[in-house]
UniProtKB/Swiss-Prot annotation:
The protein's role, per its UniProt record: Specifically methylates the pseudouridine at position 1915 (m3Psi1915) in 23S rRNA.
Organism expressing this protein natively: Levilactobacillus brevis (strain ATCC 367 / BCRC 12310 / CIP 105137 / JCM 1170 / LMG 11437 / NCIMB 947 / NCTC 947)
EC number(s) on file: 2.1.1.177
Gene name for this UniProt entry: rlmH
Protein name: Ribosomal RNA large subunit methyltransferase H
Subcellular compartments: Cytoplasm
């Protein structure tokens, strides 16, 4: 099984890098885990709607270029469906049972994801109505993917 994150921007904070590295190490016994970073589009403060649309379109094209046809894609979106950790674990298990060995999660930049990226996604997932920095979301998502594997294994990690 392959789990891939396609994310906008680089991770700068050492503490996020360390947390993700720890969960990536733990995930290595269950899957091949990778993170593909696409450059964020530089944009000035106080963007007009047209400038926001341009920035999102550029980032969206970069994201879509990193997704293969065979990949099952989750887009992280505030308007996506919320799931419990148990329901998410069952989804991952069901996807593998039904032949989806390549699962990709997309985390957009500060302006979100374009309609084209959301359309390409097989499903949209939300971690609630909070707005979180995409760097933090990367760590939270990595932990939740690890938790899903632990739930499916029957491990006491998920209490």
């Amino acid at each position: 099984m392959n789990i891939k994150f396609v994310v906008v921007g680089k991770l700068k904070e050492k503490y996020f890098k360390q947390g993700i590295a720890e969960y990536a190490k733990r995930l290595s016994r269950f899957c091949k885990f990778s993170i593909v970073e696409v450059p964020d589009e530089k944009a000035p403060e106080n963007l007009s709607q047209a400038e926001m649309d341009r920035v999102m379109a550029e980032e969206g094209e970069r994201i879509l270029a990193k997704i293969k046809d065979r990949e099952y894609v989750y887009a992280l979106a505030i308007l996506g469906k919320e799931r419990s950790s148990e329901a998410f674990a069952k989804e991952i298990k069901d996807l593998t049972t039904y032949g989806h060995s390549d699962i990709t999660f997309v985390i957009g930049g500060s302006l979100g994801l374009t309609p084209a990226v959301l359309k390409r996604a097989d499903t949209q997932i939300s971690f609630g109505k909070f707005t979180l920095p995409h760097q933090l979301m990367r760590l939270v998502l990595t932990e939740q993917v690890y938790r899903a594997f632990m739930i499916n294994e029957g491990s006491p990690y998920h209490k």
